[in-house]
Regions:
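N-terminal Rossmann-like dinucleotide/flavin-binding domain of flavoprotein oxidoreductases
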Residues: 31-50, 186-196
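Glycine-centered tight beta-turn/hairpin loop motif at sheet-sheet or coil-to-beta transitions
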Residues: 22, 66-67, 221-223
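Glycine-rich FAD pyrophosphate-binding loop
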Residues: 1-20
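Conserved donor sugar-nucleotide recognition element shared by glycan-biosynthetic enzymes
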Residues: 13-14, 154, 182
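Mobile amphipathic helical/loop "lid" adjacent to a hydrophobic cofactor/ligand pocket
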Residues: 25, 36-159
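Helical element adjacent to the flavin cofactor pocket in flavoenzyme catalytic cores
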Residues: 159-220, 226
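Mid-domain catalytic core of redox enzymes
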Residues: 204-309
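Short glycine/proline- and charge-enriched loop/turn segments
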Residues: 19-28
Length: 309
């Protein structure tokens, strides 16, 4: 078995960097959390590798218009972190609509062609529910602009929320994270592979994959071409399609249909990007600056909370 890796390190999305006040704190900047209910295979892998797992804190908060409106979902204290929201009819209607949506959305979204916009009309929720709860929450989940959410398939959203127990106020799956960062499982997996005589080639980008009768040919950036009995691609759909020298029509259709949203990620310690009201500080924070004029979504992952730092 030969493992081709274009980067000079293993892990891909599992990327741990050393940061912190004293420069000795491992922080994940890619793969961060999982749960046993929705990720049985990776849970089995971690158990097999004897990776140390610790609980994560999975909370959501939102800040709008530079802090004019803020709330969190961790507790009643964070929901009404801004005490004036308890006397704001639109905010209270939003909370009522959350319960209404959670109880009706699954039964209403049986039509696979229904969009989220159509679903909200069927359920009959307010604009505050859409603008200050559902779209920020789903935007945080998929890191995509809220403006694109209206046309998003309702069925995909509801299935995700159902699988992750987000259609109820309680009973969410316990989030888990790797003690010491995801680098720990990458290192153990590397050791396991090497013990089984897997040849690992770092910094060896594959440029083309060709199928020749009963063999598969791989050509790397160095011009080297080798034949293998089988090839497994652990790459994004668009990357996979670009690697195939002779993709079938089915491969073109299937792989080409998957779209991605580009995002920039910055590891920092700037508290000004957190909510003004500290009771709203959460593991995931959706934020909109004052007089927002960009379609880009701004999210802050509070790593101290997510990784128990």
């Amino acid at each position: 078995v030969v493992w081709f890796e274009s980067e000079k390190r293993l892990g891909g999305h599992a990327r741990t960097v050393t940061a912190g006040k004293y420069g000795n704190q491992p922080v994940d900047t890619g793969f961060i959390v999982f749960n046993k209910a929705n990720y049985p295979n990776i849970t089995k892998l971690f158990n097999d590798l004897e990776v140390k797992i610790v609980n994560s804190n999975m909370t959501f908060g939102a800040s709008f218009d530079g802090g004019r409106l803020e709330y969190g979902l961790a507790s009643l204290n964070s929901v009404f972190a801004q005490r004036q929201n308890a006397f704001r009819p639109k905010f209270l209607r939003m909370l009522k609509d959350i319960t209404k949506f959670n109880s009706q959305a699954e039964s209403v979204s049986k039509n696979s062609d229904m969009s989220i916009e159509q679903l909200l009309k069927e359920v009959g929720t307010s604009s505050w529910f859409k603008d200050y709860y559902l779209f920020p929450l789903t935007g945080a989940i998929w890191s995509m602009p809220v403006e694109q959410m209206e046309s998003f398939p309702a069925e995909a959203l509801i299935n995700f929320m159902k699988n992750h127990a987000l259609l109820s106020m309680t009973g969410q799956h316990q989030g888990l994270t790797i003690s010491g960062g995801s680098i720990k499982y990458v290192e153990k997996l590397e050791q396991r592979m090497k013990s089984q005589n897997v040849e690992i080639r770092l910094g060896c980008k594959v440029n083309k994959i060709s199928r020749n009768f009963d063999k598969v040919s791989i050509k790397t950036q160095f011009g080297l071409e080798e034949e293998f009995d089988e090839v497994v691609l652990a790459t994004h759909a668009d990357d996979t399609l670009s690697l195939l020298a002779d993709p079938t029509e089915h491969e073109k259709t299937s792989l080409g249909a998957i779209q991605y949203q580009e995002n920039d990620a910055v590891l920092h310690a700037d508290q000004s990007l957190m909510p003004v009201t500290k009771r709203v500080w959460s593991s995931w924070v959706y934020s909109e600056s004052k007089n927002k004029n960009s379609k880009r979504i701004d999210l802050t992952y509070w790593m101290n909370s997510l990784q128990s730092i």
